Curated annotation (Swiss-Prot):
This is ATP-dependent Clp protease ATP-binding subunit ClpX. Pfam families: AAA_2, ClpB_D2-small, zf-C4_ClpX. Zn(2+) binds at C15, C18, C37, C40. The keyword Kinase does not apply. It comes from Salmonella typhi.
Length: 423
């Protein structure tokens, strides 16, 4: 390596690539009859990085997991919902297989299959979408349908969803086009009424209309810094036909719509089959029978439903399932709090009756798995506040009375003989 000075021959040295002299650059690296400056080295590194980015998607496509592998991975993080996991595994596999084969197979154009998840709050809709994105190593973003409005009205534009996806992958368009978008609370943008109104429904049917093209597939022009505040910026062209859209919602009341259809179809009169009240299907059984006509009656427009051909229904979680969620998944809530306490050098034990009490409390609140953390947090708050200031605590035990708020966690101290001798 030569420094910014003349070599032994007294000649001024120049970069063999850009022609700059040794005085115009910070470093000049010498080889056999050739020189390269630090600026050209940086440029070469940039070119290599760009090529690696272009090759990376091909590596991802060649390692596409099978539906069985996708289902197995979901089982590690999501308890229950077996049918929904199977539907998702097949839909996701087919979507990325379509991308790998360039949207066509033997001259047949492969259609896009977006997904609609229906099920009560806390049943695992968001977790399923997040887990899929992690498994496939693709960009993932979430949007709340209740914040969206038609373009030109106060609120979040539909195109901002793609903006968020681009932000997740540092504005790499190719990477964003392989991403997953989860739109939550999709049931909240149902049409407010079957009758046309003088006032425009900008947050209901209007948003459904705005989402149509985005979900079906269009080339969206998205400014790199968001919004329409900087019209002079160069827009990024994103093909949304390659993005997988998953829409989810609780659809409260949809079971009644389905029940009306099912019961009406049973007929009336002398030849009708009379059903006892005990024969009525549960909410979960009814939701599993959902048809497009039910969603239309609920308030989604036919064109929007047509863009979501794959429908998966998640059931309300039972007490047993909630207990499993508390202790079985890889990132189970009890394991997370035990890891936190271990950082203080303390063991944390949840007794079985405590886990059942947590599950019953979540069911009473109708928050599903989403409400489990707040219940555990409330039970452990005082202990987590005091523990860092306490000495010789070896173990904390949580039983049913702690969850019910009737007593404090049991603290087990170590070194009793040392404490006795100190007294």
């Amino acid at each position: 390596m030569t420094d910014k000075r003349k070599d032994g021959s007294g000649k001024l040295l120049y970069c063999s690539f850009c022609g700059k002299s040794q005085h115009e650059v910070r470093k000049l690296i010498a080889g056999p009859s050739v020189y390269i400056c630090d600026e050209c080295v940086d440029l070469c590194n940039d070119i290599i990085r760009e090529e690696i980015k272009e090759v990376a998607p091909h590596r991802e496509r060649s390692a596409l997991p099978t539906p069985h592998e996708i289902r197995t991975h979901l089982d590690d993080y999501v308890i229950g919902q077996e049918q929904a996991k199977k539907v998702l595994a097949v839909a996701v596999y087919n979507h990325y297989k379509r991308l790998r084969n360039g949207d066509t197979s033997n001259g047949v154009e492969l259609g896009k299959s977006n997904i609609l998840l229906t099920g009560p709050t806390g049943s695992g809709k968001t977790l399923l979408a997040e887990t899929l994105a992690r498994l496939l190593d693709v960009p993932f973003t979430m949007a709340d349908a209740t914040t969206l409005t038609e373009a030109g009205y106060v609120g979040e534009d539909v195109e901002n969803i793609i903006q968020k996806l681009l932000q997740k992958c540092d504005y790499d368009v190719q990477k964003a086009q392989r991403g997953i978008v989860y739109i939550d609370e999709i049931d909240k943008i149902s049409r407010k009424s079957d009758n046309p109104s003088i006032t425009r429904d900008v947050s209901g049917e209007g948003v459904q209309q705005a989402l149509l093209k985005l979900i079906e597939g269009t080339v969206a022009a998205v400014p790199p810094q968001g919004g329409r505040k900087h019209p002079q910026q160069e827009f990024l062209q994103v093909d949304t036909s390659k993005i997988l859209f998953i829409c989810g919602g609780a659809f409260a009341g949809l079971d009644k719509v389905i029940a009306n259809r099912v019961e009406t179809g049973s007929g009336i009169g002398f030849g009708a089959t009379v059903k006892a009240k005990s024969d009525k299907a549960s909410e979960g059984e009814l939701l599993s029978q959902v048809e497009p006509e039910d969603l239309i009656k609920f308030g989604l427009i036919p064109e929007f439903i047509g863009r979501l051909p794959v429908v998966a229904t998640l059931n309300e979680l039972s007490e047993e399932a909630l207990v499993q969620i508390l202790k079985e998944p890889k990132n189970a809530l009890t394991k997370q709090y035990q890891a936190l306490f271990n950082l203080e050098g303390v063991d944390l034990e949840f007794r079985d009756e405590a886990l059942n009490a947590i599950a019953r409390k979540a069911m009473a609140r109708k928050t599903g798995a989403r409400g489990l953390r707040s219940i555990v947090e409330a039970a452990l708050l005082d202990t987590m506040y005091d523990l860092p200031s306490m000495e010789d605590v070896e173990k904390v035990v949580i039983d049913e009375s702690v969850i019910a708020g009737q007593s404090k966690p049991l603290l087990i101290y170590g070194k009793p003989e040392a404490q006795a001798s100190g007294e």
